[in-house]
Amino acid sequence: MDKKAARIRRATRARRKLQELGATRLVVHRTPRHIYAQVIAPNGSEVLVAASTVEKAIAEQLKSTGNKDAASAIGKAIAERALEKGIKDVSFDRSGFQYHGRVQALADAAREAGLQF
């Protein structure tokens, strides 16, 4: 099993459990160059809020889009957008990535900005 298949296996197990709970998910995806965050409805059919370093307004404010500072900016942005829509409680879906580095920075920034998970 290669690295990507193992990550997808971990993500599938976590998502299955979150679907059973019927929780609104804060999903994180990272690539070497960018980081993405989405708040997804409990049934999984609708993206309620999204933010990423691909967005021009966010990318222009950052020195680099693939570091912890960028992840923190995305965490803050996703939390602000979710709170505007009345979403306060979410479950954190790390998509099989280790809770470390950029993923952790995004989660910490989202918590500081008011999201609860």
From Swiss-Prot:
GO terms for biological process: translation. It comes from the Bacteria. InterPro entries: Ribosomal_uL18_bac-type (IPR004389), Ribosomal_uL18_bac/euk (IPR005484). One of its GO terms (cellular component) is cytosolic large ribosomal subunit. The gene is rplR. Belongs to the universal ribosomal protein uL18 family. CDD domains: Ribosomal_L18_L5e (cd00432). Keywords: Ribonucleoprotein, Ribosomal protein, RNA-binding, rRNA-binding. This is Large ribosomal subunit protein uL18. Part of the 50S ribosomal subunit; part of the 5S rRNA/L5/L18/L25 subcomplex. Contacts the 5S and 23S rRNAs. It comes from Pectobacterium carotovorum subsp. carotovorum (strain PC1). One of its GO terms (molecular function) is 5S rRNA binding. NCBIfam families: L18_bact (TIGR00060). This is one of the proteins that bind and probably mediate the attachment of the 5S RNA into the large ribosomal subunit, where it forms part of the central protuberance.
